[in-house]
Structures are given as C-alpha cells and as structure tokens.
Amino acid sequence: MTTIDTISDVITRIRNANILKLDRVELINTKVAIGICHILKDRGFINSFGEFLNSSDRMSNRRFIQKYIIVNLKYKGERRSPCIKELRRISKPGRRVYVGYKNLHKTKGGIELFVLSTSKGLITDYTAREKGIGGELLFSIC
C-alpha cells in the first residue's frame, strides 16, 4: 500500500493508538517517520521505538520485505492517561505553511511543541529559534 502523505499517516496512527490506549503502534519505515520518532522520544512523549523487517508472500513466489517501526507509547498514572494530549497537522499537501524563526512564538505556557521541516532536517520550534532558521511548520504536539 502506498501512502501519499506519510506525515499525516504517522500522526493518525499514533493518535488512534493513544485513543485506544495501546502499548505499541506500527508505522511504515520512512526517514520522516524516524525523524518524528526521534523528536517524540527526545521530548519524552514516547518510551522507545525500533525498526524491524516484516516479510509476506504475495503474487505467487515473489517475496516482498517491508520495514516497519514499532513505537512504544507512554502513559501516565494508574488511569493510563496518554502523554500526548493533542497531535495536530498544520501544513498539509494542499496548503503548505512556512514560518521564519522570528514568527515562532511560545504558546500555551511552553507546553505546545511545533515540529518544522528545515534544510537541517526535522527540528522543534525551540531548536529553530535557537539556530535562527525557519521552515515548513508540519504539526504540533501538546
């Protein structure tokens, strides 16, 4: 199966797994998905993630191998409330949103985190302000 928008796919899978309070979620392995997982792990939104190969028999004797990422989600307390409260896509394929580093302001008391795609790779809004670079505003995490 091919996905057009891998960022939305990653966000939707994580959001749905959080709603169902699953321990882990399976993502298709792309460079963008790995970058998102690194940011989520560094900021403490997930426990861990790892890559693995999954092979399946299709179309007679051909063997297709697909790489996946397993993300171990993080919850708080006995009631297992998710660490990720809100995951919202901002820049979409039909409507791109670009920002300069001067236009990145702290919001919601510093709780909300923005992820940008820049020439230096995927970075958070804090890092973008620190380095003085702007880029495409992909999504926000709360």
Curated annotation (Swiss-Prot):
Keyword annotations of the record: Plastid, Ribonucleoprotein, Ribosomal protein, RNA-binding, rRNA-binding
Subcellular location: Plastid
Residue ranges of coiled coil: none
Gene3D superfamilies: 3.30.1370.30, 3.30.1490.10
A Gene Ontology BP annotation from the UniProt entry: translation
Any one GO cellular component localisation term in the record: ribonucleoprotein complex
MF annotations from Gene Ontology: rRNA binding; structural constituent of ribosome
Xref: InterPro entries: Ribosomal_uS8, Ribosomal_uS8_CS, Ribosomal_uS8_sf
Pfam families the record matches: Ribosomal_S8 (PF00410)
Cited SUPFAM superfamilies: Ribosomal protein S8
Role played: One of the primary rRNA binding proteins, it binds directly to 16S rRNA central domain where it helps coordinate assembly of the platform of the 30S subunit.
Self-association state and partner proteins as the record states: Part of the 30S ribosomal subunit.
Family indicated by similarity: Belongs to the universal ribosomal protein uS8 family.
Protein name: Small ribosomal subunit protein uS8c
Species assigned in the record: Euglena longa
Gene, per the UniProt record: rps8
